[in-house]
Amino acid sequence: MPSLLPLVLTFLSVSSPSWCQNSDIESLKASNGDSFPWNNMRLPEYMTPIHYDLMIHANLSTLTFWGKTEVEIIASRPTSTIIMHSHHLQISKATLRRGAGEMLSEEPLKVLEYPAHEQVALLAAQPLLAGSLYTVIIDYAANLSESFHGFYKSTYRTQEGEMRILAATQFEPTAARMAFPCFDEPALKASFSIKIKRDPRHLAISNMPLVKSVNVAEGLIEDHFDITVKMSTYLVAFIISDFKSVSKMTKSGVKVSVYAVPDKINQADYALDAAVTLLEFYEDYFNIPYPLPKQDLAAIPDFQSGAMENWGLTTYRESSLLYDKEKSSASSKLGITMIVSHELAHQWFGNLVTMEWWNDLWLNEGFAKFMEFVSVTVTHPELKVEDYFFGKCFNAMEVDALNSSHPVSTPVENPAQIREMFDDVSYEKGACILNMLRDYLSADTFKRGIVQYLQKYSYKNTKNEDLWNSMMHICPTDGTQTMDGFCSRSQHSSSTSHWRQEVVDVKTMMNTWTLQKGFPLITITVSGRNVHMKQEHYMKGSERFPETGYLWHVPLTFITSKSDSVQRFLLKTKTDVLILPEAVQWIKFNVGMNGYYIVHYADDGWASLSGLLKEAHTTISSNDRASLINNAFQLVSIEKLSIEKALDLTLYLKNETEIMPIFQALNELIPMYKLMEKRDMIEVETQFKDFLLKLLKDLIDKQTWTDEGSVSERMLRSQLLLLACVRNYQPCVQRAERYFREWKSSNGNMSIPIDVTLAVFAVGAQNTEGWDFLYSKYQSSLSSTEKSQIEFSLCTSKDPEKLQWLLDQSFKGEIIKTQEFPHILTLIGRNPVGYPLAWKFLRENWNKLVQKFELGSSSIAHMVMGTTDQFSTRARLEEVKGFFSSLKENGSQLRCVQQTIETIEENIRWMDKNFDKIRLWLQKEKPELL
């Protein structure tokens, strides 16, 4: 799950391996040289698991574990071959039993391994009978994984400096097979009975509550956990640790507990309260009780992603769950709430109802991302999360505007391709098209559809079309319910709304959004009362690629200078015309950025909107202002709007005070000078940075150095002061230096307002003494927010030796956890002094990085893009192409590689076309900035 990092932090600072898959090959060779009887990445459809009995015994001293898997299976046709998943497991013995009876043979089953497919074949002497129940018993052993997936080792240091070891699991998408032999595909659901053998000083937790503990030997306890509901293998979880916990009950009697290392359990209260509130919300919203007796949330010291939705035992990075009242930031509170909300939404979307295969991952992730906003808007209204939603859509559009993007629902087969699906298209675009559909249907109608979907498919698996079919019959026809929104609109037609009811064809409409990559650009041309609309596929660098000819069913919304009530129009064709009741001065489409499309206003349309922002910007909402800023710069990229007009539009920001338009402007403007940094254009680069400071100076000067205000006001303060200090704005730098001196003199004990800490630390890190002091404080800090603030600050150093040392240390993982490495590499990749070091480190350590973080993972994508996607010279482009093409099956075909190459090509083209125009624009007098 993507973490919520402030936008400015990031800026200041595919196919996969050639898995053997040729159906023409009669048989593959197993690792012992014998013929392997199955040549498909997917498991046979004729074998179904019913129930697993798992016994796991981990030794946290030798970092090994032993296991016994007993899995009940049924074959739909006679077969003597059982194909299962197994990866890095040493199978010592496999036997077969019919039903609950005796062994069929004293002779163990023959075991063949085919590591390239992560499969084993168990060969029975006699064919299994169709429709009969059998039990496969497998004994095996393995090392605890040194990566972040499978059954892996994690460590932490106590306040006294003692190193402690624990073992945790991360199975999604394809790593359950690293902990026990299994049928590791999401549609092969089964129930699980889990037993864990452990040392008496440790605690074991799993998906279900503990039933009993048995002393099986001196110094060895076996914990028996209750049988699970029917679920996919990737949702199984267990942890062996010395964690402490705090608990509360929901109104419906579900026990909610937060687990953490003993020194940090006092930071668990906020997440616990949020989890209880959110679980109660979801039970009510979905009208389906949470089906398990408990929900644990565990903070794992080493964790690659943000969090994981294992049923009944959700796992998190410490920074995604633990909240320190004294030191955690406003953005941390927002982030924790959203991530907990996301994982708890999965208990229904993903766990109760699961996609049939990973090509429809978005049914899990898009829904959970969308439900974050639906739930937290209600449960924590003070966070105002609805303001941040459209930012997710812009994130998705960044990658979805490239030719290398993919449809929301797209075929995948091997593990690396599956891992690549965990991207902004599955999460953010998935959420945005659901939000657009909700806006189209109305909140109540949409809710009826998804409740119907969840109830119909509970404990089952679904495809894309199953969701749309559930949305087809959602308007009540018997008059028993008050009709709202879409359903009431469907009863009468309107001359300005093409949403009148022939038949609600949600499926046809939504297939245009899930089965095609990209998104539409809508061009609006106003002529008197006539509004001409045209749609086309928005794609950067489209002149290099053939026309796609895609058409979408676009639910357009608009307001005008004459009416602020939202008007609606469903555009199904390439062009159409709507007629307004009267002529207008301006028209603004995509109200609130609820639609996943961008808009170009032809003729004098942009001039009218630019004038509106200049004269009376609060006439339209802050989200509408932010979307205008975004759309203007997106249009510059495809030469529909000049860079001068886009920059002119931003001049109104002198009077802006709201977080989202300012963040969106920074999102557009900061990358422009980052591209200049890579071309050694110091004079214009400096002028551009000065322009940005002048634009925001009044608002920067108004910021108090306190923690007062709403969450959005506090987040804005933190980012503006950081920007001012990093850009060397002296009033900010001098105050930050004073704070840092006092904080350092107190040996880090003095309390600094949380919202200004980032700016203070960034200034303090600019000399050797300050940098070293910050690093020493990092080692002893128990606060995730403070550690991330120090990490960021250390990465802003202009000393190449410090930056190189930081790369080496974070990769080793002794003091700075290796989980932080992708973020540190990216921050140094954004540093004007550090970016060559980051790019060099990525190349020299590629094989180790892939081993640790896995090919196709979002961490690998984050590092590839973070070190290269702001390059803007042909020399760097050739370097990038040369390096990745040399990798062959170890990364050359990754989607993130295609994305970064496209992005660099776009950067070069953009700079060649716009740099001189920017230089001249900066030289012109701007009365707005005086």
From Swiss-Prot:
Record topology, Cytoplasmic segments: 1-2
Cofactor descriptive note: Binds 1 zinc ion per subunit.
EC number: 3.4.11.-
Glycosylated residues (UniProt): N59, N143, N403, N655, N749, N890
Disulphide bonds in the chain: C393-C432, C725-C732
Record-linked PROSITE patterns: ZINC_PROTEASE
Topology feature Lumenal, residues: 24-930
Any one GO CC term of the record: cytoplasm
Entry PTM: N-glycosylated.
Pfam families per record: ERAP1_C, Peptidase_M1, Peptidase_M1_N
Keyword check for Transferase: no
Residues that hold substrate according to the record: E172, G306, A307, M308, E309, N310
Site (described: Transition state stabilizer): Y427
Top-level taxon of the source organism: Eukaryota
Subcellular location: Endoplasmic reticulum membrane
Residues annotated to bind Zn(2+): H342, H346, E365
Active site: E343
Entries under PANTHER family matching the protein: ENDOPLASMIC RETICULUM AMINOPEPTIDASE 1, PROTEASE M1 ZINC METALLOPROTEASE
Function, in words: Aminopeptidase that plays a central role in peptide trimming, a step required for the generation of most HLA class I-binding peptides. Peptide trimming is essential to customize longer precursor peptides to fit them to the correct length required for presentation on MHC class I molecules. Strongly prefers substrates 9-16 residues long. Rapidly degrades 13-mer to a 9-mer and then stops. Preferentially hydrolyzes the residue Leu and peptides with a hydrophobic C-terminus, while it has weak activity toward peptides with charged C-terminus. May play a role in the inactivation of peptide hormones.
Subunit organization: Monomer. May also exist as a heterodimer; with ERAP2. Interacts with RBMX.
Protein name in the entry: Endoplasmic reticulum aminopeptidase 1
Taxonomic lineage of the native organism: Eukaryota, Metazoa, Chordata, Craniata, Vertebrata
